[in-house]
């Protein structure tokens, strides 16, 4: 999907306020047919839209003794991804929206956020609290360090997403701006702000990031990925 297609999808989608209700009381006389309901005559868990659940509770006050509502999202346009479809290691607390592609053996750590339309290559690790923006493309066997930001192109809209080629190491808290392409085997130093394309096999650092050298054997030893962290079984 291109940027405008994603914008149109978000703009035209039916917004949802997903809510979970916990109910106690005399529930056998309440009609739950239009909801997902799990429970007994005295206790139940209800899944549905906030306004519809509130209306049901108001209309059945005489049957409900206590209730508690948990609102999972408010006017949400895009659901979270179904994690079961990925052959990857995804740790608790990662937030992945729908329409995200994740390659086999990838690792998504706690607190990572991956927005709609992003593509993560095989064996790539998205470390803790890193943000991968909409439509960003990350190749195979990369490491996106903790707190790094890979800019998205949904707002402000941009035709060209960030592209990170294979075997790239992005240090903690680095920022890659919209439309930038990082060549394969490159290393982005921690805290760098990358505002222009980086040739393959380059090491960049600073704000704004500048090429400081080519990748050498010493650099490779310091930035190698650990295959054992990508094992699923």
Swiss-Prot record:
GO biological process: diaminopimelate biosynthetic process; lysine biosynthetic process via diaminopimelate
PROSITE patterns linked: HEXAPEP_TRANSFERASES
Keywords: Acyltransferase, Amino-acid biosynthesis, Diaminopimelate biosynthesis, Lysine biosynthesis, Repeat, Transferase
Stated family: Belongs to the transferase hexapeptide repeat family. DapH subfamily.
Source species taxonomy: Bacteria, Thermotogati, Thermotogota, Thermotogae, Thermotogales
Full protein name: 2,3,4,5-tetrahydropyridine-2,6-dicarboxylate N-acetyltransferase
CDD domains found in the cross-reference section: LbH_THP_succinylT
TM segment ranges: none
Gene3D superfamilies: Hexapeptide repeat proteins, Malonyl-CoA ACP transacylase, ACP-binding
InterPro entries, per the entry: DapH, DapH_N, Hexapep, Hexapep_transf_CS, Trans_hexapeptide_repeat, Trimer_LpxA-like_sf
NCBIfam families the UniProt entry points to: DapD_Ac (TIGR03532)
Known EC number: 2.3.1.89
């Amino acid at each position: 999907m291109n940027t405008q297609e994603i914008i149109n999808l978000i703009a035209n989608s039916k917004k949802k306020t997903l809510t979970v209700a916990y109910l106690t009381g005399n529930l056998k006389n309440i009609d739950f047919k239009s909801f997902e309901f799990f429970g007994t005559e005295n206790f139940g868990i209800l899944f549905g839209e906030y306004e519809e659940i509130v209306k049901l509770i108001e209309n059945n006050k005489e049957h409900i003794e206590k209730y508690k509502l948990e609102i999972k999202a408010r006017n949400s346009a895009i659901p979270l991804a179904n994690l079961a479809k990925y052959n990857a290691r995804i740790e608790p607390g990662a937030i992945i929206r729908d329409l995200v592609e994740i390659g086999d053996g990838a690792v998504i750590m706690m607190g990572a956020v991956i927005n709609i339309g992003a593509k993560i290559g095989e064996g790539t690790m998205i470390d803790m609290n890193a943000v991968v923006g909409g439509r960003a493309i990350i190749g195979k066997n990369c490491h996106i360090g903790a707190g790094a930001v890979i800019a998205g192109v949904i707002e402000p809209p941009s035709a060209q997403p960030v592209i990170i080629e294979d075997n790239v190491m992005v240090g903690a808290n680095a920022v890659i701006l919209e439309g930038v392409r990082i060549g394969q085997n490159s290393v982005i130093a921690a805290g760098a702000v990358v505002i222009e394309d980086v040739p393959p096999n380059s090491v960049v650092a600073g704000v704004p990031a500048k090429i400081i050298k080519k990748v050498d054997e010493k650099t490779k030893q310091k930035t190698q990925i650990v295959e054992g962290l990508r094992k699923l079984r």
